[in-house]
Structure formats: structure tokens, C-alpha cells
């Protein structure tokens, strides 16, 4: 098997696992036993929509890190991307489990989100490792801000969702700092604006679909 074919097969396997297999977390879910509160129908619907958006974000994170791990030629940086991907995999598992508990479904457009994020990750990776790391920094900072807004919007009684989102927010901030420390280049203002616009489109659509 050629290296290129091996890489392609691994990428396809990762996509299928992310989109169709039940995710398994390597860390314990941060929810606290005994804090569960009965939510109203409206509160469950709101939490379900917000957690669906967060689940989409984790689908995209798997795609981004997979693409960047494929494109880098630096073994240490590849290990960095894969380690971050494993933590994002925990987020994927936690958000999916919480969706099930809330009686909500994942986004119907997850294959589209994955494909788009994988393409962006490939593009960033082709522009060089420092650009790729800069893309990680900006992505994670935007995700951190987005999660902070969800902590303000989630029902006060939804302790489980709030605990998950709070842990995710902390992890995303650390991922951004790790990428910055690894030598990330800052993204130009137009690129940041385009990323924000794309994120708004995704989150608005995923809220309903």
C-alpha cells in the first residue's frame, strides 16, 4: 500500500467514524451526579438546539485536525494535532450523549459540515505549518467565545449541558494557547472576518437543522 493511499484510507475511516459511529470518550463526562433538574419542554428544546450546534462544532473539529495532521510533514506537529483531536473526540462524545438525553438529534447536515471543515483544514495545511497553527488559534478562540455565549443562553437548571460546555470552553482555550506557543502566525483581518461569517452561517443553520 502506498503512503498516499494509506493516508486517504485513514482519512476516510476517520470521517466515517465521526459521522456514523457512536463516539467514545477517553475522559469522564464533566456532569455532576445529583445536580440534574427537570427541564420544561421549552428549556429542553433550547438546550437541544444549542447542544446540536456544539456537536456540529466538534464534528468540524475532527475534520480540521484530521486534515491538518495529514498535511503537516513535522512528526511532532502531527502528534500535537492528533492529541488535540482526541480531546475534541471527548467533546464529540459528550455532546452526542447529551443530545440523546435531551431527546434531540444531531444536525442533518453533518456530512456537509465535515467535508467543508476538512477542505479548510487541507487548505490551511498546504499553506504551511505556521499558517495551519494560526488557523487553529483563530478557530479555537472563536469557538471559545461561542461557548461562552452558550453558557449565557443555556437554562440555569440545565446543569449537565452547562458543565459540558464549561469544560469544552476551557479545553478550547488551552488548544488555542498550545497552537500559539507552537509558532502560529496571526490570521489577517479579512480571513478572521470570513471565518466568523462562515461560523455564523453554520451555527444558525445547525440550530434548526
Curated annotation (Swiss-Prot):
Its cofactor is Fe cation. Pathway: Cofactor biosynthesis; ubiquinone biosynthesis. Fe cation 1 binds at residues 58, 88, 91, 172. GO terms for molecular function: 3-demethoxyubiquinol 3-hydroxylase activity; metal ion binding. GO terms for biological process: ubiquinone biosynthetic process. It is a peripheral membrane protein. It catalyses: a 5-methoxy-2-methyl-3-(all-trans-polyprenyl)benzene-1,4-diol + AH2 + O2 = a 3-demethylubiquinol + A + H2O. Signal peptide: none annotated. InterPro entries: COQ7_proteobact (IPR047809), Ferritin-like (IPR012347), Ferritin-like_SF (IPR009078), Ubq_synth_Coq7 (IPR011566). Binds 2 iron ions per subunit. The keyword Cell membrane applies. Keywords: Cell membrane, Iron, Membrane, Metal-binding, Monooxygenase, Oxidoreductase, Ubiquinone biosynthesis. Belongs to the COQ7 family. This is 3-demethoxyubiquinol 3-hydroxylase.
Amino acid at each position: 500500500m502506498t503512503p498516499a493511499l494509506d493516508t486517504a484510507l485513514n482519512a476516510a475511516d476517520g470521517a466515517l467514524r465521526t459521522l456514523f459511529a457512536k463516539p467514545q470518550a477517553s475522559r469522564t463526562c464533566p456532569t455532576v451526579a445529583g445536580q440534574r433538574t427537570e427541564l420544561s419542554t421549552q428549556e429542553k428544546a433550547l438546550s437541544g438546539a444549542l447542544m446540536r450546534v456544539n456537536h456540529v462544532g466538534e464534528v468540524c473539529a475532527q475534520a480540521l485536525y484530521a486534515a491538518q495532521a495529514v498535511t503537516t510533514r513535522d512528526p511532532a506537529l502531527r502528534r500535537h494535532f492528533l492529541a488535540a483531536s482526541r480531546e475534541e473526540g471527548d467533546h464529540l462524545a459528550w455532546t452526542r450523549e447529551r443530545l440523546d438525553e435531551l431527546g434531540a438529534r444531531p444536525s442533518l447536515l453533518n456530512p456537509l459540515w465535515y467535508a467543508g471543515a476538512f477542505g479548510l483544514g487541507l487548505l490551511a495545511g498546504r499553506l504551511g505549518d505556521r499558517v495551519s497553527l494560526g488557523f487553529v488559534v483563530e478557530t479555537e478562540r472563536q469557538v471559545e467565545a461561542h461557548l461562552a455565549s452558550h453558557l449565557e443562553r443555556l437554562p440555569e437548571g440545565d446543569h449537565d449541558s452547562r458543565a459540558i460546555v464549561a469544560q469544552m470552553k476551557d479545553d478550547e482555550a488551552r488548544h488555542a494557547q498550545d497552537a500559539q506557543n507552537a509558532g502560529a502566525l496571526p490570521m489577517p483581518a479579512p480571513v478572521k472576518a470570513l471565518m466568523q461569517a462562515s461560523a455564523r452561517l453554520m451555527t444558525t443553520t445547525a440550530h434548526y437543522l
